[in-house]
Amino acid sequence: MRLIAALLSVLLIASTAQSTVTIYESSKPGDFDFYLFVQQWIYSYCDSQTCIQNKEREAFTIHGLWPENSDGSYPSFCSGPSFNVNAIQDLEDQLNFDWPSLTGPNTDFWTHEFSKHGTCSITGPITDIHDYFATGIKLYTEFNITAALESENIYPSDSNTYKPVDITNAITTHFGGKPGIQCSSGQLSTVAVCIDKNSLSIMDCPDLQGWSCSGSVKFPSTA
């Protein structure tokens, strides 16, 4: 009986763990459904992290351009070229401002993002390392989240709170595609727009695992 109970306990733990684990998928480059173009609000991020002070400002910055599947799985660390900073030398000044690491060297962050996500993105209009980062910059210019929110009177504030549905609707109205949003400690922290992998145009995001906010949230103006 003691052995049976132990086995049942192990099975229960395994079953519970399996039900909460995010699906990860290793695959070949280009084998995914769409991109998530992810931007993070600096002050929300730096509220829970020790950020480099001169990088803090009132802005969204690029977190990444991530291949994604409709079922919540995603490819990562695909075979392909290794990150080489020389390939993006002409983009560095803009990347330093638009796609910075807030906690460490920018090149370390770019290496991680390309190794994990960029290697799987080499498909269609994105053919190499330079294309990957240039596309991120282009999308950042095109999808100005702060402007979208301000067009619906949603401004950074340490006192005001906003309904997540109003944030989502503001972005949808401005750009024509339903986004995903994430919150941390009651603050808007991350916004993702979904991008067609062939045309690089915005599309409605499907229901994304882990992308939701509840209650009223802040859009902080300080960390």
Swiss-Prot record:
Glycosylated sites: N144
EC code: 4.6.1.19
GO biological process: RNA catabolic process
Signal peptide: 1-25
Reactions catalysed according to its record: a ribonucleotidyl-ribonucleotide-RNA + H2O = a 3'-end 3'-phospho-ribonucleotide-RNA + a 5'-end dephospho-ribonucleoside-RNA + H(+)
GO molecular function: ribonuclease T2 activity; RNA binding; RNA endonuclease activity
Keyword Signal set for record: yes
Reported regulation of activity: Inhibited by Cu(2+) and Zn(2+).
InterPro entries: Ribonuclease_T2_eukaryotic, RNase_T2-like, RNase_T2-like_sf, RNase_T2_His_AS_1, RNase_T2_His_AS_2
pH dependence of function: Optimum pH is 5.0.
Protein name, entry field: Ribonuclease DdI
Active site feature: H63, E113, H117
Gene3D superfamilies: Ribonuclease T2-like
Coiled-coil stretches noted in the UniProt entry, renumbered to this chain: none
Record key words, sorted: Disulfide bond, Endonuclease, Glycoprotein, Hydrolase, Lyase, Lysosome, Nuclease, Signal
PANTHER family given in the database record: RIBONUCLEASE T2 (PTHR11240:SF22)
